[in-house]
């Protein structure tokens, strides 16, 4: 594994750990100002503006969600939901070191639990990453669920 592949892999693993630990403000800081977080409904969906999505949020909406999750008066999250990511080894799909642009895809199982309810999701996370200075940042995080076209309850946290 070369240095950049190792760095990209560690970034993906660190991001999942932040989510599992509930470090949402720190996680939000990984995103560029023009970032998007997208969970399409259908496999192969190419345009979030022309099709329905389970979630399509810019950084402002992500920030509002993070603030809500951090608030003491978020009664729908008392007690708080918890999550766990089980990741397959991330695969680098495209790498342009000169431009500082990378695409990494990771298969995952994700468990979200609150009280006595546990929900399992499975799918693939595709990260479009860019370098800003010496930092990697997320420009787009796309989550393709195996059953994205199924009926879902609330997805409380972030995959």
Give the positions of each predicted feature.
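Short, low-complexity N-terminal intrinsically disordered segments enriched in polar/charged residues
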Residues: 1-33
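A generic "alpha-helical surface" signal
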Residues: 6-10, 60, 120
């Amino acid at each position: 594994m070369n240095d950049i592949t190792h760095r990209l892999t560690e970034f993906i693993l660190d991001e999942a750990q932040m989510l599992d630990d509930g470090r949402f403000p720190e996680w939000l800081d990984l995103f560029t100002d023009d970032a998007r977080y997208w969970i399409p409904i259908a496999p192969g969906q190419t345009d979030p503006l022309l099709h329905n999505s389970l979630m399509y949020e810019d950084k402002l909406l992500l920030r509002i969600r993070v603030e809500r999750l951090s608030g003491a008066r978020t009664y729908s999250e008392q007690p708080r939901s918890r999550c766990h990511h089980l990741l397959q080894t991330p695969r680098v799909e495209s790498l342009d070191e000169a431009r500082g642009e990378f695409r990494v895809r990771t298969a995952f199982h994700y468990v979200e639990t609150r009280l006595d309810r546990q929900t399992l999701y499975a799918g693939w996370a595709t990260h479009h990453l860019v370098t800003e200075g010496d930092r990697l940042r997320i420009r787009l995080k796309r989550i393709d669920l195996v059953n994205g076209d199924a009926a879902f309850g609330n997805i409380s946290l972030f995959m």
